[in-house]
């Protein structure tokens, strides 16, 4: 399995320790856990942005005029099978660095862990996961915790 991550950094306040994380390796590990397939090629965009930018997207696409931590815009519809080896573009994950910094500080964990947690959450949404109720939210949070542990990160205790 191959996962190509197109990293877009639109938040100049993010430290290099976050932007230089091994995103492709992490997403490949997470995909193998959640949707194990041999020979598949995936692509996605991970955009790290500001509260102002994510608020504009949240207003435009969700009619919510407030910043949020993560948005996911899936492109997967499954209507047409792709030839083996052709990349499947999963969609875009947008994370607010501003909100991630606040949440990390409030919860007492690192910014890297917070952004990894949000990136994994976004990936699950790209793959069709949702949390319309408490049971599905618990299932999703459990999967996120397992994904972070698989790449050697300690999941945020307050979020599990």
UniProtKB/Swiss-Prot annotation:
Major localization listed first in the record, in broad terms: cytoplasm
GO molecular function: metalloendopeptidase activity; RNA endonuclease activity; zinc ion binding
Origin organism lineage: Bacteria, Bacillati, Cyanobacteriota, Cyanophyceae, Acaryochloridales
PROSITE patterns given in the database record: UPF0054
EC annotation from Swiss-Prot or TrEMBL: 3.1.-.-
Organism, scientific name: Thermosynechococcus vestitus (strain NIES-2133 / IAM M-273 / BP-1)
Binding residues for Zn(2+): 121, 125, 131
Name by which UniProt lists this protein: Endoribonuclease YbeY
Cofactor note as given: Binds 1 zinc ion.
PANTHER family for the chain: ENDORIBONUCLEASE YBEY, CHLOROPLASTIC
